[in-house]
A protein has these predicted regions:
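A short coil-to-beta-strand element that immediately follows conserved catalytic motifs
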Residues: 94-103
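Nudix hydrolase/Nudix homology domain
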Residues: 129, 135-192
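Conserved Nudix-box catalytic region and its N-terminal flanking loop in Nudix hydrolases
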Residues: 48-89
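Short, charged/polar surface micro-motifs in flexible loops or helix N-caps
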Residues: 43-48, 57-58, 74, 121-129
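Active-site-adjacent beta-strand/loop module that shapes the phosphate/pyrophosphate-binding cleft
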Residues: 106-131, 145
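Acidic, metal-coordinating catalytic segment for phosphate/diphosphate chemistry
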Residues: 2-39, 45
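A generic structural micro-feature
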Residues: 32-33, 62-65, 112-116, 136-141
């Protein structure tokens, strides 16, 4: 294992990342649940990336964040189906799963949760209507961000002003960089 910038990384195979992170923003008391999450770095043929912007005021504070589209895996649902469903709901995107990027294990101590974030690289085929939940519309005020790679990195850095933004950036910037590496190297790997 190689340690870089406080992040432990090792290859699951020759191409997938495994990143293990601790919550350094809130004190640990206990963890009472694990959450399986399917997430994606989404890009189009012109080189733009798509993310969600959340503007929220809750236990995590009054914050604005950038985050990959994704969410909880439903009972009986496989990871690839979950990521496609989440991308359709949150971005209105029909996508092709190019490959699995990796797995990030992280914690939200404030809500006593351990997250298993399964990241995929997905290419946009088309956009249609989004199907946001009530909370996504009214509590998180989700909107879509279309950014260049450099613009996305700047936005993650800008959102580090909040504790939640720092946790998200620590989890997602290494994944975004790996996704860009895959795209630059042809992007064609087995998605399974």
């Amino acid at each position: 294992m190689v340690k870089k910038e406080g992040v432990k990384k090792c290859a699951l195979d020759d191409s997938e990342l495994l990143i293990e992170l601790q919550d350094t923003e809130w004190p640990f008391t206990y963890t009472d649940h694990d959450r399986q999450i399917a997430r994606a770095i989404v890009y189009d043929e012109t080189g733009f990336f798509y993310f969600v912007r959340a503007q929220r005021e809750d236990d995590f504070g009054k914050v604005v964040t950038i985050e990959t589209s994704g969410g909880g895996v439903e009972p009986g649902e496989d990871l690839r189906s979950a990521v496609r469903r989440e991308l359709k709901e949150e971005l209105g995107a029909e996508t092709e799963v190019v490959c699995k990027i990796g797995l990030v294990s992280d914690y939200y101590n404030l809500v006593h949760r351990h997250n298993w974030n399964h990241y995929y690289l997905c290419r946009v085929k088309s956009f249609g209507d989004r199907n946001l939940t009530r909370d996504e519309r009214e509590a998180f005020h989700l909107s879509t961000l279309r950014l260049s790679f450099d613009g996305a990195v700047r936005e993650y850095e800008r959102c580090r002003v909040s504790a939640l933004g720092r946790l998200i950036a620590a989890r997602e910037l290494p994944i975004l960089r790996k996704a860009m590496e895959i795209i630059e190297n042809g992007g064609e790997r087995n998605a399974d």
